[in-house]
Regions:
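Short coil/turn motifs that cap or connect alpha-helices
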Residues: 62, 151, 161-163
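Transmembrane helix-bundle core of multi-pass membrane transporters
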Residues: 75-139, 164-168
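Single transmembrane alpha-helix segments in multi-pass membrane proteins
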Residues: 1-41, 66-71
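Generic alpha-helical transmembrane segments of integral inner-membrane proteins
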Residues: 8-9, 50-62, 89, 123-131
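Alpha-helical transmembrane segments within multi-pass membrane transporters and channels
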Residues: 42-82
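Hydrophobic alpha-helical transmembrane segments
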Residues: 3-4, 25-29, 46-54, 76-77, ...
Length: 170
């Protein structure tokens, strides 16, 4: 389910004719942030999830800002650099040690339990896929993402803030 969730986020970048090489490192860094909190005694799974999501979103925002505000030549360059920064950051915050969530029953439940015979992680992926489908097909933001991917200049001329859409996608 990890690859399925990462590919969902990557889909937005691909639709806008870009690429984000840092998605795996971003997910790893976010998990290491949560792992650092577990090592410090935090056992609230909701807070761990919020920290991981906020951390990953912040990194994506930085990637988007590097691309749209600093006008780096191609997303390949900025996200490749960010990938290396995130790998280093993950090693620093974990002190190059393996982090285990085995003492946290709620986190273990998410990764190993089933509901009606389906793994919980699979159900989470399905929910995220449905949300992404609704976002891309039923909202103005979804149409804007497709427009920016098709022709950023035409999207800008039609009133779409291409820079904001690209920043959102990363």
């Amino acid at each position: 389910s990890f690859n399925a969730l990462v590919s969902t986020g990557m889909l937005l970048c691909l639709i806008t004719a870009g690429i984000d090489l840092s998605v795996g490192a971003n997910a790893t860094f976010a998990a290491c942030l949560a792992g650092m909190l577990v090592n410090k005694g935090m056992n609230n799974p909701v807070l761990l999830l919020v920290v991981a999501i906020v951390g990953g979103t912040l990194i994506g925002w930085i990637n988007g800002m590097l691309l749209t505000r600093l006008h780096l030549p191609h997303p390949f360059v900025s996200t490749l650099g960010m990938k290396n920064v995130l790998w280093g950051g993950a090693l620093i915050i974990t002190n190059s040690q393996m982090v285990s969530f085995s003492g946290n029953d709620a986190v273990m439940w998410l990764g190993s339990s089933t509901v009606a015979g389906f793994p919980v992680s699979f159900i989470v992926v399905l929910v995220i896929y449905v949300i992404m489908h609704i976002l891309l097909t039923k909202t103005a933001l979804g149409r804007s993402i497709y427009c920016v991917g098709g022709n950023p200049e035409a999207a800008r001329l039609s009133g779409i803030n291409s820079a904001n859409v690209l920043t959102f996608c990363y």
